[in-house]
A protein has these predicted regions:
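Residue-level signal for the nucleotide or nucleotide-sugar donor/cofactor binding architecture
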Residues: 30, 60, 102, 115-118
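Residues in well-ordered alpha-helical elements
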Residues: 33, 63, 105, 118-121
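Amphipathic terminal alpha-helices
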Residues: 118-132
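Short, glycine/charged-enriched secondary-structure capping and boundary segments
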Residues: 8-14, 67-69, 116-117
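Soluble, non-transmembrane catalytic domains of enzymes that act on hydrophobic metabolites at membranes
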Residues: 6, 26-27, 33, 125-129
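Glycine/proline-rich active-site loop of Rossmann-fold NAD(P)-dependent oxidoreductases
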Residues: 1-15, 20, 33, 41-52, ...
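Conserved C-terminal active-site "lid" loop/helix of NAD(P)H-dependent oxidoreductases
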Residues: 67, 86-114
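Mid/C-terminal beta-alpha module of Rossmann-like enzyme folds, strongest
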Residues: 38-92
Length: 132
């Protein structure tokens, strides 16, 4: 879950940021406004037997997200480390322990959801615009 108050833009802008690279590690995200709309839609169309995966349309690697943001705000991130080279204490296990691509088909079919932020690109464009 990310949005104006919860994102990695500030850490990248601080220029005190180390990129941790784990190839092939995908993660599904959702912008807070889309999450709110999905919750409201599920309350308005309750279906007790449905389980909804709440995610945008574009599972992506953290590296892809960081590349996109850094290019948009013209910051070069030179500090990077491969996840595999970190000691166990240094590993950010809560984020990197799972590798998930989530299918959001049911939120669209059953709830009629049209995502305002279908990928991290639209979401971070909004966050960057709000910070300018």
């Amino acid at each position: 879950i990310y949005g104006p108050e919860r994102n990695i833009l500030g850490r990248i802008q601080s220029r005190n940021f180390t990129r941790i690279i784990k190839k092939g590690h995908f993660f599904s995200r959702i912008y807070i406004n889309d999450l709110t709309n999905i919750i409201l839609a599920s309350m308005n169309k309750p279906n007790p037997i449905s389980i909804y995966n709440i995610a945008d349309d574009c599972p992506s690697t953290l590296d892809d997200v960081i590349d996109y943001i850094s290019k948009k705000i013209s910051i070069i991130i030179s500090d990077e480390v491969l996840y595999e080279t970190l000691s166990k204490k240094e590993q950010i296990e809560s984020f990197f322990s799972e590798n998930k691509k989530v299918n959001n088909r049911l939120i669209k079919e059953e709830l009629g959801i049209i995502l305002e932020y279908p990928s991290y690109k639209e979401g971070y464009n909004q966050i960057i615009n709000l910070n300018n």
